[in-house]
Amino acid sequence: GYMFPNYENTVSVVDIGTFREEGRIPVAVNLHHLLADSDGRLWVSSRGDYYGNTSALFCITDPAGTPQVQRITTQDGTDLVVENMTLRGDSMYVIGTEFSYATMQNHTNYGIVNVRTRQVLTTNFITDGTDASIMEPYGIAVHPHTGEILIGDARTHVNPGTLFCFSPEGLLLWKVRTGDIPAHFAFLYER
């Protein structure tokens, strides 16, 4: 996690019966999120160090046995910026904005990764240009039945945010003002 300048860089393997650490898997600096897919792979995001180590997404196969760590990049070798991520079926949706002190610029993406092939399908699933109005993509969820994509825009992190809803095709369906830093979602269903 965030321990500047000596960032931790490992995922711990814990025996659930004894709750003892059995090992550590080196991944990258400043780890942030961890998800498991339906095939037992772990997906880990790194925030990088805001200088030379960029934010990135990693896949760990066989985490309890002989773990292999793969950095997930686009076809041209570019890292995905990952502030938050969520799974729906074989698709991992990732959002993020990364600031670099080296370039003094932000880099933003709205990616989809096929978790079976570990291939980046797109770095911008928003297809209607609405991404230009999102200041700070912070939270993401995908409706399990409709495939609608929800993005929480934290904007300035001190003022009200915005919740955007996109169709599975990446078209804006609606948006609404929220409280500060919209990041988490829950779906309730009628019985």
Where on the chain are the PLM-derived regions?
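Predominantly soluble domains enriched in secretory-pathway, periplasmic, or organellar proteins
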Residues: G1-R191
